[in-house]
């Protein structure tokens, strides 16, 4: 199943439960964007009021505590890091997905065709 993003995880958790109740054997999730690690400072695209509403931040808080440095968050944003892979596995388990794979931010930037200096990526990497 493809969705635009996973913010809190509520909607996909409910959809996944519905699919399993109605006979699905597996549920594979492919969000259209990288994991959201920061709440948007610029647009009100979500009902989330706190970064702790984000499923990524809740998983990180379970692993690291709530006060996490920017350096640690950058490691979780790096799709080549062990922390990133473990975060995805925790999200997959928590939401009962068979598999979960996100787009990489570097691939997303390349595919858009806009100069990276004109593209806001704050919610994914915390960079303004």
PLM segments and residue spans:
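PRPP-associated nucleotide enzymes
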Residues: 1-128
């Amino acid at each position: 199943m493809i969705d635009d993003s996973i913010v809190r995880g509520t909607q996909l958790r409910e959809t996944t439960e519905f699919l399993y109740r109605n006979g699905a054997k597996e549920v594979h999730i492919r969000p259209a964007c990288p994991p959201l690690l920061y709440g948007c400072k610029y647009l009100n695209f979500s009902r989330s009021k706190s970064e702790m509403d984000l499923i990524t931040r809740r998983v990180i808080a379970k692993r690291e505590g709530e006060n996490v440095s920017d350096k640690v968050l950058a490691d979780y944003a790096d799709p080549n890091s062990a922390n990133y892979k473990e975060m995805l596995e925790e999200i997959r388990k928590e939401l009962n997905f068979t598999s979960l794979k996100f787009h990489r931010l570097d691939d997303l930037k390349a595919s858009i065709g806009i100069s990276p200096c004109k593209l806001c990526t704050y919610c994914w990497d915390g960079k303004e």
